[in-house]
C-alpha cells in the first residue's frame, strides 16, 4: 500500500532526518480517556489509569512496529493493556521508562494486601503455558513497595503473541498507594541494569525472541481533553504521523534511566536555570516536570505560581495568556513549552483551577541532582527511545507532537520510521 500523498514528501526527506522507513504498516488500537482526581495522581507519582479496551489482536510479524494502547489518567496519566498466559488474562499496566520489570497482582496474594483485591489478579492455574519459577523479588518505587515471586508465561502485547517472559506475581503490596491506582501492574521499559533479580526486561525478550525488530519504542501522549483517547505507545519504531520532523537525537549519558544532558532552561527572556548544564531524565512514570527546589522556586516566581500544600503551585487562570514560555535546550535545540502546555487546568467541586506542571524534587549526589521531564513535557513532544545495539549507543529522539488531525490525516496508513 502506498503512503498518503501528504506523507510522500516526508519519506523523501528520511535520509536527512536520520531515520529509515521499514515499509511496514503501523498497527493501531483505539484508546480511551478517564478523569479521576489529582490528589491521588500526586500520590501515584504519575502512574497511569485503565480503561475499557478491545481484545488484543492477531500475531504480527517481527518486522512490524507494534502499537500498545494508552489511556489518559486526568490528562497526565497513561496506561495500556497486555495479556499474560494461555488463554491471555488481560491486565492494564503503566508503561514506565523508569523501571525494568513487569509485574501484576497474583491470585495468590496476601489476604491483607488491599491493593491486590481491588485489581485484576493473575491465576496460574488458568494458564496452560504457565511455568513456575518461585524466586522471591522486591521492588521499591517512589510511592510504594511490591513483594512477590517470579513466574514465567506467555506475553500478549499490541498483537504480538507467544513471547515467553519472566514476570512478577505481586503477593504483597503494603502501600495503599497502589490501592488508588486504576492500573493493575507495571511494565518497565528501562535498561536491564535496573531490573530486579536479573530478569530480562520485556523489550529485550521481544527482540531476542525475534518478535520485535529493534529495541526502539516511542510515546505519543495525547493531552487534548476533547479527544477520548490517550495516545499510542509504538514498539519497534516511531510513526511520522505523531510528530513534526525532524527528530533531534540526544545521547543517553547514563544507560540506566533514560538520562540525557540538558544544556539550559530558560523562563521567558529573563531567567536562566541549569545555567552550567545539568542532567535530565525522560520518565513516562512521572506526571509533572520536576527539578531542584531552588530552581523550581525561582521558576514559579517568574510565572506567578502561588504555593499550596504538598508542593503544588496554583496559577491564576486569567494569567495563562500572559505567562512566559519555559524552554529546554537539548541537543542544541530549544524545546519550548507555552503556558497552555505547562499549566494543568482542572475542575474541583465546580470551580476551575489552574495548577502548575512543575514540582520540586531534590535528589542528592551521587545520583542527583537532576530534572525529570515527565508527561507534561512528553505530552508536547514525542519521544523515541532507542536502546542502541553493538554498533550504536542509546539515545532519545524528540520532536514536536502533531495536533490530532493536523498535517496528516489521522488514521490514514503511514510508514514506520526507525532511528538509523
From Swiss-Prot:
Tissue specificity: Expressed predominantly in adult lung (type II pneumocytes) and kidney and in fetal lung. Low levels in adult spleen and very low levels in peripheral blood leukocytes.
Cross-referenced PROSITE patterns: ASP_PROTEASE (PS00141), PEPTIDASE_A1 (PS51767)
Organism: Homo sapiens (Human)
Name of the featured protein: Napsin-A
Peptidase A1 domain sequence ranges: 78-399
Glycosylation sites noted in the Swiss-Prot or TrEMBL record: 90, 133, 336
Residue stretches spanning the membrane: none
Catalytic residues as annotated in Swiss-Prot or TrEMBL: 96, 283
SUPFAM superfamilies attached to this UniProt entry: Acid proteases
Function: May be involved in processing of pneumocyte surfactant precursors.
